């Protein structure tokens, strides 16, 4: 809650994936059975859904969005509530923040692609932190946010800065 998942979906995913299925197995299964594309927005990545989707022949892609601090998420949710959004408790926002990263480091074993975004900076947009393909690190940001470093440990190494060759004499 408050990391920007819905905002990201509305801005970037709604057109290619117009069907946003709730994170409920009984509502997802018909899509899997009929091999229809869909997106799921949830606080925690459902690795069982990824396994079922892969078994059904799907290519799976997880887009994970977080921020540096649960208090930032709380602030965003409070603003949203002041504008008529769904009322939630501060403790549930903090709990969902903690819960969201619990299995994230394992997700790359289940998803064909995992894109990790940081949405900490106000009005600067979603920043790609890491892109993993088939469990292998494809690219990382030059600066890894602390929250991502805690989740992935040494798995994420900042992209190497290559010096430009100097001019000969």
What are these regions (language model features)?
Residues 68-72, 95:
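Short gly/pro/ser/thr-enriched loop/turn and capping motifs at secondary-structure boundaries
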Residues 4, 46, 122-123:
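Glycine-rich nucleotide phosphate-binding loop and flanking beta-alpha elements
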Residues 79-168:
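Conserved GTP-binding G-domain of TRAFAC-class P-loop NTPases and closely related GTPase folds
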Residues 3-38:
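Conserved substrate/cofactor phosphate-moiety recognition/catalytic segment
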Residues 74-77:
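Conserved SF2 helicase motif VI
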Residues 14-15, 68-69, 79-83:
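A short linear boundary/processing microfeature
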